[in-house]
Amino acid sequence: MKYLVDTHTHTIASTHAYSTLQEYIAMAKHKGIKLFATTDHGPDMADAPHFWHFVNLRVLPRIVDGVGILRGIEANIKNVVGEIDFFGDYLQELDIVLAGFHEPVFAPSNKETHTAALINCIMSGHVDIITHPGNPAYPIDIAAVAKAAAENNVALEINNSSFLTSRKGSEHNCLAIAKAVKEAGGLLVMGSDSHVAYSLGDFTQAEQIIEQADFPIERLLNRSPEALLAFLSARGHGSLDEYSALLEN
């Protein structure tokens, strides 16, 4: 199956990434990607863009050259309370909010602490997708996190980059997560976690996890732009009607 949606990308606004937004748009057009989210790292990361970068995402057109662009962030989970580094009314101006553990912000601790932080973040209502929860540096109670995510309509990510250049050893955890989310009745999403435009929409390894878990396609948010937009609308994000022209094509 060809997946037309990517929820996790980084531009040169995060200085360890290497492509501009315009290069992503061109690559999306080339690959047939209909909708992607620009989700640079939250401001607590050392090389992340300033807080105002995310506030000013409102200047971005919703659709450029037939490609839909979601205004987003990959926020950092800061502590066991589940707080993230983007807050207040500004969250409501974003189309999509991702959050995950990153070592410069939240040092690896223990299974109980990681699990509590993720569940508290999920229950906060501020985050739509938890990124790379299969990271072996942050062991979690997978069943408990999957249950909390399902109960709060939050998706867990199968991160394709985890199998390539980072977070080595994630395969076992990601398969367990896919199976647990399936059992809990929750949602999954595949994210490229692209740091260069060439990787946009590359879910090669993540797809293998989805297939091995026999995960139901109707609960995979990448299955269509309509599916992702319906999820985000249900999560309370407004202004998504501006993508109607995209859905008509």
UniProtKB/Swiss-Prot annotation:
Tell me which species this is from.
Answer: Shewanella pealeana (strain ATCC 700345 / ANG-SQ1)
Name by which UniProt lists this protein: Probable phosphatase Spea_1436
**Record-level Gene Ontology MF annotations:** phosphatase activity; zinc ion binding
Is Metal-binding tagged as a keyword? yes
Name of the top EC class for this enzyme: hydrolase
The residues that hold Zn(2+) 1 are 8, 10, 74, 193
* NCBIfam families, per the entry: PRK09248.1
Q: What is its EC number?
A: 3.1.3.-
| UniProt remark on cofactor binding | Binds 3 Zn(2+) ions per subunit.
